[in-house]
């Protein structure tokens, strides 16, 4: 009833969905109690105040249909009749609008006429205040600006060194001019000796300063690289579980590897070339003093370089995008193949997998070749412009020398100066592929860094939990357009109670425990522990006090001791051994040559399935959690391993609230209470013998199937 009542207030439904989109939890009943004073639904003012209370920045605007593509989406289309809906995307090419019908609880695609018929011109734009103050600041090239400001002293030193290098670059052509016009004409050997010594000193200083600049610059960019790498890994581990469930492992790995491209760009010659290019204006002034005509030729070539880059860049970027996509596909396929190597060998499907790999690899190589060809064409175009300018300057310069407007020394000095000007331009043009590549890398890495993390700030860190659990009116789905997984679930679990949860696959058993661990926030209702709403709790505080054992547990490539004591590497050995004994793992660990120091291999490959599972149980017990979840923890074990664990189950459950999820009913028959789920709802609950008395019940049916 409460879910249906909330559905009648579409403003509250919209606020709930937009809050979830911005990774902000809320209690709809609490919002309704505070802001829906007359019980008729949230008014416009009440809606804006409710959004503000959730740290959302909401703004009511009036916008013409033709300008909707300019606003930040999703946004709430406010209707005076209460039939609000969400505007998710505007397709300007096809004049279509992706909306979400809050009343029907389903997405819709509307034509221009259909949208205009229901649009009243009112829109509520919603953004997270965290993004406004920079907590969710977008990762792009502007991210590096604070880093540059932070290390401004080092970059200032680099700038000063660059100024001296440019001064030395000016002196060298002047020396050559003096030698050509004065020394050779007047046979001044003493002057030649002085100039030679001075030139040698300048060259030595230039080499030393150039090396010093490269060192200082590389040192500072390495610091930025370390900061970015650390930020990336912290952010990756802070992302919600839904981020990883919606993406292939290979895609995520490929995006993280783009950090290498950014690193190469930061530590390469591209940025120093940019500095050199900035000082080119000084050279232009000196070159203009020598010959305005020749300088105009050089200046006239610069638009040619720019136009050529503008022509090549979009094509190159598209090809780089395609290259990355194919590289990510290869990465994902490789990770998938290595992970599933046992299945591949068992089914003898290596030829099929190899054939798929060969096709994908050929596609990637072809894409990479197209990038190389286009980059080569771009570089040769730059060379063509450079050679053409050189020929024009040679012809025009020779005419100026013959006519007496320019000396031979001045012509040589001018050509040397023009080389100093053009060199960074050419380097930048040749490095344009790197610029495009790093742009792609920043965008791909932004997919990780721009994804909102789980919110920890402002969350409650409560005292040690006791173990009372309450699910109230829970309604949940994994995506807005996905089917409902849990519907109106109400469940009270008392402290110290052992609860078994059974049901068909897909009935929502594991989803309940994911909500309990706050991996997800329910669309409606509350999950409470000791009366505290988990939507307001710090996820780390919560998860440290819950022990979880899954069907397929992952062990890290470390020693058994390190795996058990993963949450507290410095814990006493006595606690590790006690947890191992409780899990029935101590005996087989003691028989290993290295005992608790045995390296288990990647994902525990050096151990049997039963051994891995018992270590996982020990890992879950070592912190003495007040809530323990066994999610199909024994379903894949042999009977001996399961028997060992079940023998210790009474000790394991002592003083804890335990939730046992199982398909094998023998695992839960001794539970204090058994919950039977079907299609996201609780259909039966009671003790084993009580449920068997209902011969028409689902539990009795499942029990009969297992007996047969």
Curated annotation (Swiss-Prot):
The Peptidase C39 domain, residue ranges? 1-126
GO MF term list: ABC-type transporter activity; ATP binding; ATP hydrolysis activity; ATPase-coupled lipid transmembrane transporter activity
**Protein's cellular compartments:** Cell inner membrane
Q: Which UniProt keywords apply?
A: ATP-binding, Cell inner membrane, Cell membrane, Membrane, Nucleotide-binding, Translocase, Transmembrane, Transmembrane helix, Transport
Q: Does the keyword Membrane apply?
A: yes
What GO cellular-component annotations does this UniProt entry give?
A: plasma membrane; type I protein secretion system complex
Reported impact of residue 568 to E: In strain: Serotype A2 / PH196
EC numbers on record = 7.4.2.5
What is the recorded membrane topology of this protein?
A: Multi-pass membrane protein
The entry marks the following residues as binding ATP, namely 503-510
Describe the location of the ABC transmembrane type-1 domain by residue ranges: 155-437
Pfam families reported for this sequence: ABC_membrane (PF00664), ABC_tran (PF00005), Peptidase_C39 (PF03412)
InterPro entries per record: AAA+_ATPase, ABC1_TM_dom, ABC1_TM_sf, ABC_transporter-like_ATP-bd, ABC_transporter-like_CS, ATPase_T1SS_HlyB, P-loop_NTPase, Peptidase_C39
> Where are the membrane-spanning stretches?
159-179, 192-212, 270-290, 296-316, 389-409
Q: What is its main location?
A: membrane
> Which SMART domains does the record match to this protein?
AAA
A GO biological process this protein is involved in? Answer: protein secretion by the type I secretion system
Which reaction is this enzyme known to catalyze? ATP + H2O + proteinSide 1 = ADP + phosphate + proteinSide 2
CDD domains from the UniProt entry: ABC_6TM_CyaB_HlyB_like, ABCC_Hemolysin, Peptidase_C39_likeA
Q: Where is the ABC transporter domain?
A: 469-704
Q: What is said about its interaction partners and assembly? A: Homodimer.
Q: What is known of its domains?
A: In LktB the peptidase C39 domain, the ATP-binding domain (NBD) and the transmembrane domain (TMD) are fused.
Instruction: Name the family.
Output: Belongs to the ABC transporter superfamily. Protein-1 exporter (TC 3.A.1.109) family.
Q: What does this protein do?
A: Part of the ABC transporter complex LktBD involved in leukotoxin export. Transmembrane domains (TMD) form a pore in the inner membrane and the ATP-binding domain (NBD) is responsible for energy generation.
Q: What name appears for this protein in its UniProt entry? A: Leukotoxin translocation ATP-binding protein LktB
Q: Which organism is it from?
A: Mannheimia haemolytica (Pasteurella haemolytica)
Q: Which gene encodes it?
A: lktB
